[in-house]
Swiss-Prot record:
Belongs to the phosphoglycerate kinase family. It comes from Prochlorococcus marinus (strain MIT 9211). It catalyses: (2R)-3-phosphoglycerate + ATP = (2R)-3-phospho-glyceroyl phosphate + ADP. SUPFAM superfamilies: Phosphoglycerate kinase (SSF53748). Its main location: cytoplasm. One of its GO terms (cellular component) is cytosol. The lineage of its organism: Bacteria, Bacillati, Cyanobacteriota, Cyanophyceae, Synechococcales. The gene is pgk. This is Phosphoglycerate kinase. InterPro entries: Phosphoglycerate_kinase, Phosphoglycerate_kinase_CS, Phosphoglycerate_kinase_N, Phosphoglycerate_kinase_sf.
Length: 402
């Protein structure tokens, strides 16, 4: 079901109202505590700026790291408040806690257009337990709820789900709306042919996604370390490559399922091998039926890149989740970079290209092609669960579109 969005609320409905906005500000920081990538902060700006323009009193809630219900000074949101202040061009008010007298007093004293950032919501144990008393206390800060934290939407926590029971309306922010539009749209009503490229090292972490995508897609292309589990299941020798021996039957079953549904399931035909797992390992290219003992596959080979490019050529929608190899090592990044380049070209031709979270986002950004894709998801686990066809609690809690 489609969810109600912030765009449905007018300035008249929001002016002077305190609006609780759950955002995803779980940004990477270096040893000094400086933010190394502010993408997630910038992704929330359209929602925050719209609320400011409509005269709302904006109360932002976010988590950072895994403090496990304890106050941890290294996980305070102070650097985030500073960066957000710079991006907005005016001071963001920061609280010492997400509940209690300081938060209440600052919320009550907000003026129209002010922005306040609550301290790390995971400092309170009730957040991850979805404690109704804690959710109620959060709700008392505001009158309207907006969820713009797609990256946390797969968690039924107090700030993503529990709080909606005490506030109304509960709507999606613009980032959440865009994520659902692209990811849900690709699953429910894609322009076809629809292809999925699934990579990563383990079949076990992508079982649900592969099961679901084989049901929905016209083509499924598999790369990354998980290919060796499929090869071993076919009876091929894989040398020292990563294999999940307890998933061999599953790999066979997935190939059978694709065959029975008439879905084109493509695996690489050649691989780039290394004699050890390091950036400066010796390397060679081998066909999949002639991988020598003592070598491990760390990337898809050039023939496979061509095979995948040809398969994608006529596609109208492509979802990519997971790299083709160990792209962090330059010697073994060609497969991943080639797929990124291919998708950027397809995008320019009108194909809808969706980078579905996690390492594939990092790969596209490393290749400098992020701005060439139709949509880059901000959710890791949330993207996977949505592609698996699961209900996301943070989305389910929002008001239905009339």
């Amino acid at each position: 079901m489609a969810k109600r969005s912030l765009s449905s609320l007018s300035a008249e409905e929001l002016c002077g109202k305190r609006v609780f906005v759950r955002v995803d500000f779980n940004v990477p920081v270096n040893a000094e505590g400086d933010i190394t990538d502010d993408t997630r902060i910038r992704a929330a700006l359209p929602t925050i700026k719209d609320l400011i323009d409509k005269g709302a009193r904006v109360i932002l809630s976010a988590h950072f790291g895994r403090p496990k219900g304890q106050v941890n000074d290294a996980m305070r949101l102070t650097p985030v408040a500073q960066r957000l202040s710079e991006l907005l061009g005016h001071t963001v008010i920061k609280t010492d806690s997400c509940i209690g007298s300081d938060a209440q007093a600052k919320a009550q004293s907000l003026n129209n257009g002010d922005v306040m950032l609550l301290e790390n919501v995971r400092f309170i144990q009730g957040e991850e337990k979805n404690d109704p008393d804690f959710a109620k206390e959060l709700s008392e800060l505001a009158e309207v709820y907006v969820n713009d934290a797609f990256g946390a939407a797969h968690r039924a926590h107090a700030s993503t789900e529990g709080v909606t029971k005490f506030l109304s309306p509960n709507v999606a922010g613009y980032l959440m709306e865009k994520e659902l539009q692209y990811l849900q749209g690709a699953i429910d009503s894609p322009k076809r042919p629809l292809a999925a490229i699934v990579g990563g090292s383990k079949v076990s972490s992508k079982i649900g996604v592969l099961e679901s995508l084989i049901d929905k897609c016209d083509k499924v292309l598999i790369g990354g370390g998980m290919i060796f589990t499929f090869y071993k299941a076919r009876g091929l020798s894989v040398g020292k490559s990563l294999v999940e021996d307890d998933k061999l039957e599953l790999a066979k079953a997935l190939e059978e399922k694709a065959k029975s549904k008439g879905v084109e399931l493509l695996l690489p035909t050649d691989v780039v091998l290394a004699d050890n797992f390091s950036p400066d390992a010796n390397s060679q290219i081998a066909q999949i039926n002639s991988i020598p003992e003592g070598w491990m596959g760390l990337d898809i080979g050039p023939d496979s890149v061509k095979l995948f490019q040809d398969a994608l050529e006529d596609c109208q929608t492509v979802i990519w989740n997971g790299p083709m190899g160990v792209f962090e090592f330059d010697k073994f990044a060609n497969g991943t970079n080639s797929i990124a380049t291919t998708l950027s070209v397809l995008s320019q031709k009108g194909c809808c290209t969706i980078i579905g979270g996690g390492d594939s986002v990092a790969a596209v950004e490393k290749a400098g092609l992020a701005d060439k894709m139709s949509h880059i998801s901000t959710g890791g686990g949330a993207s996977l669960e949505l592609l698996e066809g699961k209900t996301l609690p943070g989305v389910a809690a929002l008001d239905e579109l009339d």
